[in-house]
């Protein structure tokens, strides 16, 4: 996998690399290969993943054809703005 580093901005290049690796599924595969997985467990996992993919595809098709209503987008919480910095308290000159 190759990433361009522009203007010596290594942080941005690392972010791009991580995003590419995430998209390719490398992190998931590394996690799976960390320990041995029995063939029977692997087969069961792959079957469950296939069922999940088929359900997702069927749901998307049904939404596209209008058979079921599309889910409402989640309302994003509005974060309160920071209050303006209070003006420094000015003390009266004569008060002590």
Curated annotation (Swiss-Prot):
GO terms for molecular function: structural constituent of ribosome. Residues 69-96 have a biased composition (Low complexity). Pfam families: Ribosomal_S21. The lineage of its organism: Bacteria, Pseudomonadati, Pseudomonadota, Alphaproteobacteria, Hyphomicrobiales. GO terms for biological process: translation. It comes from the Bacteria. This is Small ribosomal subunit protein bS21. Belongs to the bacterial ribosomal protein bS21 family. One of its GO terms (cellular component) is ribosome. The keyword ATP-binding does not apply. InterPro entries: Ribosomal_bS21, Ribosomal_bS21_sf.
